[in-house]
Amino acid sequence: MVDREWVLKIAKLARLELKEEEIEVFQKQLSDILDFIDQLKELDTENVEPYIQEFEETPMREDEPHPSLDREKALMNAPERKDGFFVVPRVVEV
C-alpha cells in the first residue's frame, strides 16, 4: 500500500497541491497501479518475441519557411509580461 508521505512526496516533486481527500484517492490509485505492475511482472513472456517496428525512412514534411509571430501577437494573451517578455512563476529554487 502506498502511504500518505509517499503521495505527498510525489505531489511535491510534481509541484501539485493536493486537498486532503485527493491524497486518499491518489493513495488508492497509485497502489492499484503498482499492484497491476506486479501482476504484469508475473506473466510468462519467455516464448514471446519482442515487438520491434522499424521504418526504412522516417516520414518528414518539407521544410518550408513561414513568417513567425511578431512579438505583440505572441504576447497578446500572456497573463503577465514585462519589457516584451513573458513573466512566469519561478520553478527553480535558489
Swiss-Prot record:
GO terms for biological process: glutaminyl-tRNAGln biosynthesis via transamidation; regulation of translational fidelity; translation. One of its GO terms (molecular function) is glutaminyl-tRNA synthase (glutamine-hydrolyzing) activity. The keyword Ligase applies. It holds the Pfam family GatC. It comes from the Bacteria. It is an enzyme of class 6 (ligase). Belongs to the GatC family. Heterotrimer of A, B and C subunits. Allows the formation of correctly charged Asn-tRNA(Asn) or Gln-tRNA(Gln) through the transamidation of misacylated Asp-tRNA(Asn) or Glu-tRNA(Gln) in organisms which lack either or both of asparaginyl-tRNA or glutaminyl-tRNA synthetases. The reaction takes place in the presence of glutamine and ATP through an activated phospho-Asp-tRNA(Asn) or phospho-Glu-tRNA(Gln). PANTHER family: GLUTAMYL-TRNA(GLN) AMIDOTRANSFERASE SUBUNIT C, MITOCHONDRIAL. This is Glutamyl-tRNA(Gln) amidotransferase subunit C. The gene is gatC.
